[in-house]
Structure formats: structure tokens, C-alpha cells
């Protein structure tokens, strides 16, 4: 059955199978160097070995080798890759097979093994021509006669012995026979060839079973395949030549279109990268991360911080109302503007301002000097700080980065935005209003200045109506030595000095009627001013003297909270 090993058979069974098989088995047993072989005979001379019938020994060895090779090939064809027994157990093929007559061995041959005799004969009697022929044929016989490597459970010594025996037998037989080219150069077809086994190799009936098992193992070893060994030093092995090249598949039109699109994208990306590289060549290379070396003399770049998103908040501290772009800025503002004490004083004699931080003091100290290191590249105007230059540059560029989130008002400076944001919260910031036009102001003094500038007639009329009117011609307008007022008569204005109108002409003084309407004005420049004692002066001043009306602010009635400042004071 396939896959099963054949058990060794006894000598009696071998005799029953046939005499020719026993003869082949005996021939192979005679050639095998066993462990129980007879010891070698004493050394003989070369002439005695030649006279012992070298030609017959050569024929015997050649016949044995041919029989073994024939049986091995036949079994390979019938049962591929199976464990098979020795060729001695199978009968020879062909009905006309006649074994050759066996020659009785001589006494000298019984003393020495046939293998040693063949070796000695070849070494002594071989011609130079035969040696050259054997050397040329040797590479071809190796592929036929080399035995296969043993498995792990078989002995390696037996494998080497069988290889040596087969190679020596084929050499000796080919040197004596004329069929050298047929055996070595071409491999015969097993189905068309008949092999003859000589009769001289018939084994006697007394072969032990142990010897038969050893012979069977040797034949199995010779028939097995050589296992693969990966030798890294083998330069002739080229695995890429053994592989079958896959057939190229036909590419569809879609694949070509996708490839064309990819090529276009790659070309566009390459062009963009080239443009970026050209732009970056002008710029300085980016600084590498890590610690700064001691020998690095390049200027230190400021640390970049990401700006937080804009979230306008207002400072709720009393009297502040500053608008900031993020709650984090608000915390910083409250800490350094309201909680931290001002301990840095400006050393300038005419200043004396206080600051919370030293850098604020250093920035302020530049204003007391005439040093202007920051120059505008558009108009060549110089500034004392880089911040002032940056704000000024926005005038040329038209940039207004700050914007009111309520009405969209844009400006360049944060102070302008803070001033603008107060308009949207008029109830808290503009608590003082004009009672004539209703305009609101942040300070009370701004209302008084507004009335004196925008509504002077109404202010004078209200003042004279409340005071019943009086003509002032005193030179002491500051009230340091006030003259007593005389009572009015017949609804006319009363002079402060005796005979004030005697030497005065029409149009040189102010005369008010009882209704509070003026008839004429004194010559000179009219003005309304607040004196030191809280009185109001309305009149004209000249180099010769000053004339006008002096009124108490307590008699103004509804406008008692209004304080009138000099018209030179700044207003909105």
C-alpha cells in the first residue's frame, strides 16, 4: 500500500521469490563494506594483482552497478517518493533474461574485498588517456550516481560509504567497457530498456536477516531526495529567476485619468513650493528649538503668545470704566491699576508723578528729554516711543484696528475707544446736563463752560432778572474792596460811585431796564467771569479801567448749582 513501509523478508522467502533476485542481492552484498568484513590480506605486489584477472573483476563491478541503477530507476517510476526495499527482492524484468555464468572466486579474492581490488587495479593499470576521459565524464556522473542525503534517524557513515562505492564502481566499469557515452551523457528511458543481471551475483541461501536490513536501508538512503539547505555563500542561486513573472493587467481608462489628475496636482504643488521657497529665501531661517548656546550671539526673539479671542469687558471699579478686550486683561488691569500702590516717583523737579511699575517710570522719563529715536518712514516725523510711532503710522496706512462692538465706531487708539464707550452708558458717565439745550456732560464745570460759551445772553438775562439789575463802574472787579450798592430809582440802573454817569457818554456803559433787557453796552470787550468771592462779573475791561455788573451767585435761583468758569477753559 502507498505510505506503508515494507517489512524485511527472511532468506527462505527470498529463495522462493526467485534465483535471479537472489543473485542480484548477493552481488550488492559482496560490494557492500560491512562491519563484519574479513581483515585485509597482506600487501601484494602490482604484478600479482594484474595476473589475477582484472578484466573479470571490472566486468563484475560494472554489472553490479548497472543492475542496482536499473532497479532504482524502475522503482522510482512505479512508486514515486515511497519507501522501497532493495532491488534484490524484485525479480528481473523480461522473459528472456539469462544470467551470466558465475565464476568461482579465487582464494585471493576471498581475502580481499572487490572494492579494494578495483581501486588498486585502477590506480596501477589506468592509462593516461583513460584518466583524462574519466575526468571529463566525472561532472556528468555525479548527477546520476550521487546518493541522497540521509534522514535524521539513519547513519551518516553508511551514506558516505555507499556514495564512495557507487562512484568507484562506475569509474572502474566505464574504464573497461565501451558504453561510456550512453550511461553518462544520456539518461535512458526506463520503459524501453531491459537490464541483465549476471549469474555470478546470485547470493547463497545462507544470508542473515540483519545483513538484509542493512542493505535495504542503504538502498533507501541512496534513493531519497537531497533536502534543501540555505547556503548564504552560494552565489549561483538566483531565486528571482525561478519565479514566474505575473502577466501585466490591462489598465482601464479611469486609472489613466486618475494618474493624470495626480500628476497635475503634483506639478501644481511643486510650483507652489518653489514660490514659497523663493519667498522664504529673503526671510531669516526659523530658529531651532532648544536651549540657547553660550556662543550664540544672535539677538533673542521675543516669545510669541497667542492672542485670546476678543471679549470686551469693562472695569467696574469706582470712577474707572476702562474697557478691556478680554477678562484676563481685566484681572491684570485691576491688580496693577487699582490694587497696587504707586511707589515709583518721577525724579523730574516739575513733575513728581507716581507709577506702580518701574517700567512705567522709565517710559515716562523719556518725555522729559528731547531724545526721539523713532522716525516715521512716510513723513520723517520723530517720536519718543515705538508705540507712538505705531499709532502715527496708522494715519498713513488708514488702518483703524479698534472697533466699537455696539455701533461699529472705529479708531486707532484705545483711549479713543474708551472715551467713545462712555456715550453708550450716558446715565452712569454723563450725570450733568445743560438746562437750556439738554446736553449732558461728565463734569459740572463742563456745564458752566458750555453755558458761558453757547448761551451767554440767556445767562446774563437770568442773572440780572434775579438781581433786579445794577450798573457797575467800579475798578475793583475782584471784590477785594467791594462798594456798597445803592438802591435803584425809577427802575433805572444805579451807579456804584457818585456821579458815575456824569462824565460818561452813551454806549460807554451797560444800562439795564427793570425787565432785564439791556439798552446799551459799555465800550470795550465784554466778558463774564467768576470772581474769588463767588460773585459774577459781567462787563468790559480796558487799559483805563473796568466797568460792568457784579452779581452774587446766590440770587440766581434755578441755576444756583451752575458755576461759570473763564471762557478760556477747555470744553468738549
UniProtKB/Swiss-Prot annotation:
Ranges annotated as biased composition (Basic residues): 72-85
Gene (name only): Zfp91
InterPro entries (alphabetical): Zinc_finger_trans_reg (IPR051061), Znf_C2H2_sf (IPR036236), Znf_C2H2_type (IPR013087)
The protein's name: E3 ubiquitin-protein ligase ZFP91
Annotated localization: Nucleus
Keyword Phosphoprotein: yes
Region (Interaction with MAP3K14/NIK): 340-370
One example of a Gene Ontology biological process annotation: activation of NF-kappaB-inducing kinase activity
Entry keyword set: Metal-binding, Nucleus, Phosphoprotein, Repeat, Transferase, Ubl conjugation pathway, Zinc, Zinc-finger
Tissue specificity note: Found in all the examined tissues including brain, heart, kidney, lung, liver, spleen, thymus, skeletal muscle, ovary and testis.
Residue spans of biased composition, Basic and acidic residues class: 1-12, 122-131, 226-247, 254-271
Enzyme Commission number: 2.3.2.27
Pfam families, sorted: zf-C2H2
Function field: Atypical E3 ubiquitin-protein ligase that mediates 'Lys-63'-linked ubiquitination of MAP3K14/NIK, leading to stabilize and activate MAP3K14/NIK. It thereby acts as an activator of the non-canonical NF-kappa-B2/NFKB2 pathway. May also play an important role in cell proliferation and/or anti-apoptosis.
Subunit structure: Interacts with MAP3K14/NIK.
Catalytic class of the enzyme: transferase
Chain positions of all zinc fingers (C2H2-type): 313-338, 344-368, 374-396, 402-424, 432-455
Organism: Mus musculus
Substrates-to-products reaction catalysed: S-ubiquitinyl-[E2 ubiquitin-conjugating enzyme]-L-cysteine + [acceptor protein]-L-lysine = [E2 ubiquitin-conjugating enzyme]-L-cysteine + N(6)-ubiquitinyl-[acceptor protein]-L-lysine
Recorded family membership: Belongs to the krueppel C2H2-type zinc-finger protein family.
MF term (GO), any: ubiquitin-protein transferase activity
Amino acid at each position: 500500500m502507498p505510505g506503508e513501509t515494507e517489512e524485511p523478508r527472511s532468506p527462505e522467502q527470498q529463495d522462493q521469490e526467485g534465483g535471479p533476485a537472489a543473485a542480484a542481492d548477493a552481488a550488492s552484498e559482496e560490494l557492500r563494506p560491512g562491519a563484519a568484513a574479513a581483515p585485509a590480506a597482506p600487501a601484494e605486489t602490482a604484478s600479482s594483482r594484474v595476473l589475477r584477472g582484472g578484466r573479470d573483476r571490472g566486468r563484475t563491478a560494472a554489472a553490479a552497478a548497472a543492475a542496482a541503477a536499473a532497479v532504482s530507476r524502475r522503482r522510482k517510476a512505479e512508486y514515486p517518493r515511497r519507501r522501497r526495499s532493495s532491488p534484490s527482492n524484485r525479480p528481473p524484468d523480461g522473459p528472456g533474461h539469462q544470467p551470466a555464468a558465475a565464476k568461482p572466486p579465487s582464494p585471493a579474492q576471498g581475502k580481499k574485498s572487490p572494492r579494494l581490488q578495483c581501486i588498486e587495479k585502477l590506480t596501477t593499470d589506468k592509462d593516461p588517456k583513460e584518466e583524462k576521459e574519466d575526468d571529463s565524464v566525472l561532472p556528468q556522473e555525479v548527477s546520476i550516481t550521487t546518493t541522497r542525503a540521509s534522514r535524521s534517524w539513519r547513519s551518516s557513515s553508511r551514506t558516505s560509504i555507499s556514495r564512495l562505492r557507487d562512484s568507484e564502481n562506475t569509474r572502474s566499469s566505464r574504464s573497461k567497457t565501451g558504453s561510456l557515452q550512453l550511461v553518462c551523457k544520456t539518461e535512458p528511458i526506463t520503459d524501453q530498456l531491459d537490464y541483465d543481471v549476471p549469474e555470478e551475483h546470485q547470493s547463497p541461501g545462507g544470508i542473515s536477516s540483519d545483513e538484509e536490513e542493512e542493505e535495504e536501508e542503504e538502498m533507501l538512503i541512496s534513493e531519497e531526495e537531497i533536502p534543501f539547505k540555505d547556503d548564504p555563500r552560494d552565489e549561483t542561486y538566483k531565486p528571482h529567476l525561478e519565479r514566474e513573472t505575473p502577466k501585466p493587467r490591462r489598465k482601464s481608462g479611469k486609472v489613466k485619468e486618475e494618474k493624470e489628475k495626480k500628476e497635475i496636482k503634483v506639478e501644481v504643488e511643486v510650483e507652489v513650493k518653489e514660490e514659497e521657497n523663493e519667498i522664504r529665501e529673503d526671510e531669516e531661517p526659523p530658529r531651532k528649538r532648544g536651549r540657547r548656546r553660550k556662543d550664540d550671539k544672535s539677538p533673542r526673539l521675543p516669545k510669541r503668545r497667542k492672542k485670546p479671542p476678543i471679549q470686551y469687558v469693562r472695569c467696574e471699579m469706582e470712577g474707572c470704566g476702562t474697557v478691556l478686550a478680554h477678562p484676563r486683561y481685566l484681572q491684570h488691569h485691576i491688580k496693577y491699576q487699582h490694587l497696587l500702590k504707586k511707589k515709583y516717583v518721577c525724579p523730574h523737579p516739575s513733575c513728581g508723578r507716581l507709577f506702580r511699575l518701574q517700567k512705567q517710570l522709565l517710559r515716562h522719563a523719556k518725555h522729559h528729554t528731547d531724545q526721539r529715536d523713532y522716525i516715521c518712514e512716510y513723513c520723517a516725523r520723530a517720536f519718543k516711543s515705538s508705540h507712538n510711532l505705531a499709532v502715527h503710522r496708522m494715519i498713513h496706512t488708514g488702518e483703524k484696528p479698534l472697533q466699537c462692538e455696539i455701533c461699529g465706531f472705529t479708531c486707532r487708539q484705545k483711549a479713543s475707544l474708551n472715551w467713545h464707550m462712555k456715550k453708550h452708558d450716558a446715565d452712569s458717565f454723563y450725570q450733568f446736563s445743560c438746562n437750556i439745550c439738554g446736553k449732558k456732560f461728565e463734569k459740572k464745570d463742563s456745564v458752566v463752560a458750555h453755558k458761558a460759551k453757547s448761551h451767554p445772553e440767556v445767562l446774563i438775562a437770568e442773572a440780572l432778572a434775579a438781581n433786579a439789575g445794577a450798573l457797575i463802574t467800579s475798578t475793583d472787579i475782584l471784590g477785594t474792596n467791594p462798594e456798597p450798592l445803592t438802591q435803584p430809582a425809577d427802575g433805572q440802573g444805579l451807579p456804584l460811585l457818585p456821579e458815575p454817569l456824569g462824565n460818561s457818554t452813551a454806549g460807554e456803559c451797560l444800562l439795564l431796564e427793570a425787565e432785564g433787557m439791556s439798552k446799551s453796552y459799555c465800550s470795550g470787550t465784554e466778558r463774564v467771569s467768576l470772581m474769588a468771592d463767588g460773585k459774577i462779573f459781567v462787563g468790559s475791561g480796558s487799559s483805563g479801567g473796568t466797568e460792568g455788573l457784579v452779581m452774587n451767585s446766590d440770587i440766581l435761583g434755578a441755576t444756583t448749582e451752575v458755576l461759570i468758569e473763564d471762557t478760556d477753559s477747555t470744553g468738549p
